[in-house]
Amino acid sequence: MESSDAKTVLVVDDEPEIRKLVGAMVSRFGHTVLTADSGEHALTLIKHGHPIELLITDVIAPGMSGPMLADKLSALHPGLKVLYISGYDNSHIVKKYVVEKGHALLAKPFTVDALREKIEALLGPVPTTKSV
């Protein structure tokens, strides 16, 4: 892996198991991973100087929704890529938050390969030579 190819990915989910699992997968792909259990926690991380290239967040979350978080982080990091993960397959979510804003959506449950494909579509090839 060439470290210059690695991107920093912020994984935000209020469910610890999902946050840990997605973070582990993204790390195995060769990226640097930051995690947060809420939108508020994510904003604190970013305001303390942690640059990110990709936000992976649930659409529906207590406190601050994924789209609201994405809007706030995009204001701080123009060009931020966003991947929503959701158990809801709702066409208005897809239209409003994915198509109109150029973000991506991955339906739960998903496979490692599906996650890798979405990340590659947003950030380019995953910078690893290891088999995942």
Which residues does each predicted region cover?
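Conserved sequence signature across two-component system core domains
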Residues: 12-13, 36, 55
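Receiver (REC) domain active-site loop signature in two-component systems and cognate sites
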Residues: 61
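Alpha4 helix (beta4-alpha4-beta5 surface) of REC/receiver domains from two-component response regulators
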Residues: 68, 72-75, 80-107, 113-120
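Short hydrophobic/Thr-rich beta-strand motif most characteristic of the beta2 strand and flanking loop
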Residues: 30-37, 45, 106
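Active-site residues of response regulator receiver
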Residues: 58
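Short acidic/polar segment at the start of the alpha1 helix of CheY-like receiver
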Residues: 15-19
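Charged docking surfaces used in two-component/phosphorelay signaling
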Residues: 20-28
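Acidic catalytic/metal-coordinating carboxylates
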Residues: 37-41, 65-69
